[in-house]
Each structure stands twice: as structure tokens, then as C-alpha cells.
């Protein structure tokens, strides 16, 4: 099946459900360690795309890294919306938005 881009927006909860439905069986077979290694590899590809300053490649690689991080979260039972919620009201350290932490 060829990739298609859409303008559809997904909540983190919806993303986790779709990643689970699409890749969950393979992720469980690969295990946490193997899936984590794939995520690390994708983060490396994000770094390469950043250095190349290629917006299309960067979007692609960030999408891949997000999908693999979502797989890791699914395997270890982390709800990404709950994990991200600590940033809703600003910086979790100083409580401000924008952040006013020293050295940040």
C-alpha cells in the first residue's frame, strides 16, 4: 500500500491505538529492547535530516521516530497523553510559558 498524506489530525490516544492495531503484534514479538533500538536508529536518522536541512526528509524521519516511540510506549504501558500532560500549563520545572528556567 502506498503512503498517503492526509490533513487529518490525530490525538496521541488515537495515534497509540492506530500504531497498536498496525504494528502491535510485531512490536510484541520484537520486544521492548528491539523496539527501543529501532527508535534510537530513527532518532539518528532525524539527526541526519537536521544536518541536511531537508524539510521533507525531516518530516518523514520525525514521523518515523514518533511512530517507534509510540510503539515503545505501547509496549511498556505508557499513555502518551498522560505523559505529555505535564507540559500543558507550561514548563514543568518553573511553571512558566515561555520557560524562564536559568540556562534553558
Predicted regions and their residues:
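Flexible "arm" and connector segments at domain edges
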Residues: 1-62, 66-104
Amino acid at each position: 500500500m502506498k503512503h498517503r498524506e492526509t490533513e487529518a489530525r490525530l490525538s496521541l490516544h488515537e495515534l497509540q491505538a492506530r500504531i497498536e492495531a498496525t504494528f502491535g503484534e510485531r512490536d510484541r514479538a520484537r520486544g521492548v529492547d528491539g523496539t527501543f533500538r529501532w527508535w534510537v536508529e530513527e532518532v539518528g536518522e532525524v539527526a541526519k535530516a537536521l544536518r541536511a536541512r531537508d524539510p521533507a526528509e525531516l518530516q518523514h524521519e520525525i514521523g518515523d521516530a514518533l511512530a517507534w516511540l509510540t510503539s515503545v510506549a505501547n509496549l511498556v504501558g505508557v499513555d502518551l497523553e498522560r505523559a505529555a500532560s505535564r507540559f500543558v500549563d507550561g514548563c514543568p520545572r518553573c511553571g512558566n510559558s515561555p520557560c524562564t528556567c536559568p540556562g534553558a
